[in-house]
Amino acid sequence: MSNGIVIIGSGFAARQLVKNIRKQDATIPLTLIAADSMDEYNKPDLSHVISQGQRADDLTRQTAGEFAEQFNLHLFPQTWVTDIDAEARVVKSQNNQWQYDKLVLATGASAFVPPVPGRELMLTLNSQQEYRACETQLRDARRVLIVGGGLIGSELAMDFCRAGKAVTLIDNAASILASLMPPEVSSRLQHRLTEMGVYLLLKSQLQGLEKTDSGILATLDHQRSIEVDAVIAATGLRPETALARRAGLTINRGVCVDSYLQTSNDDIYALGDYAEINGQVLPFLQPIQLSAMVLAKNLLGNNTPLKLPTMLVKIKTPELPLHLAGETQRQDLRWQINTERQGMVARGVDDADQLRAFVVSEDRMKEAFGLLKTLPM
């Protein structure tokens, strides 16, 4: 490969790929292009920065220069890719262009901001760069509104509450974590958040935001309103697929790839939050790690299909942490819930009494690996 491999992106997926490639080939040219600084940080830490009193710069684990030196890379930070010419195998920015033999798209996904009037007043915490832009406002805020009661929204609500802030969480679902599990399973965490002082506005809709002299006025449905100092959007992630579209790639919820992480173009691959693998979007660390291992082999000519095991998802709410696995969102499961003071085990079984999913909490999380072995592959 005279031109080598070009990777667009510098987050967890891109770095895992680089490490796996370099384990197998120390000399193949590797070029990384990204719109950010390319410094390494641990993205899950963003759910805990406020209670930990951390600044954005505290999150940096390795600078871009150190990364480039360690793994023999050509890095182009603070660089926006404007176009991909798939036929000529060229990546273009405003001032530069790079020829590639193989191209990997690993640009992640952006936080979705609900399209309501005043949406520009909403903050997002999807990157170190985004946190750096709003850390002073968040640190000084006494009243915080979190829009979205999913995994990230629940983690942030607990973190801001632990930091002594008045937290309101709004979601149009009837319970928190509604896309992950039924209300009878999430109720333990929901109750804990309420006990801590989080004000839950469920089955509620944010209609607009307006700056006032004393903060931000959030208008809700049913003629309600609340004044806060900061509003955070935690309503999910959306891959930015415009670049892939211009390259003529097949797009659905992400860039569509097969078991080899290959897109509809033989020389272009996708990884991480950006990729939709055989119809699945898996924005969690373990599938990204496994995908990076397989993709490194494929890029170097050792074609290997990705085979994902059943994996744990961890909800990092320190006062009441949860692990879950399997088809927890299935509507037809019967849930057998065993609750004790030290934790909960919830088993989701089908009509044949076959375990299909489980959720465990607190001290009973140690039972997760035993349950994981009994789930069908």
Curated annotation (Swiss-Prot):
Going by the record, the broad EC class of this enzyme is oxidoreductase
Q: Name one GO molecular function term.
A: oxidoreductase activity, acting on iron-sulfur proteins as donors, NAD or NADP as acceptor
* Obligatory cofactor(s): FAD
Its UniProt pathway annotation is: Nitrogen metabolism; nitric oxide reduction
Mainly localized where?
cytoplasm
**Protein localization:** Cytoplasm
Please give the SUPFAM superfamilies that the UniProt record associates with this protein. FAD/NAD(P)-binding domain
This enzyme catalyses: 2 reduced [nitric oxide reductase rubredoxin domain] + NAD(+) + H(+) = 2 oxidized [nitric oxide reductase rubredoxin domain] + NADH
The record's EC number reads 1.18.1.-
What is the superkingdom listed in this entry's lineage?
Answer: Bacteria
Per the record, what is one GO cellular component? cytoplasm
Recorded family membership? Belongs to the FAD-dependent oxidoreductase family.
Instruction: Briefly state the protein's biological role.
Output: One of at least two accessory proteins for anaerobic nitric oxide (NO) reductase. Reduces the rubredoxin moiety of NO reductase.
For this protein, the record's PANTHER family field holds:
NITRITE REDUCTASE [NAD(P)H] (PTHR43429:SF3), PYRIDINE NUCLEOTIDE-DISULFIDE OXIDOREDUCTASE DOMAIN-CONTAINING (PTHR43429)
Q: Which HAMAP family match?
A: NorW
Q: What protein name applies here? A: Nitric oxide reductase FlRd-NAD(+) reductase
| Organism taxonomic ancestry | Bacteria, Pseudomonadati, Pseudomonadota, Gammaproteobacteria, Enterobacterales
| Gene that this polypeptide is encoded by | norW
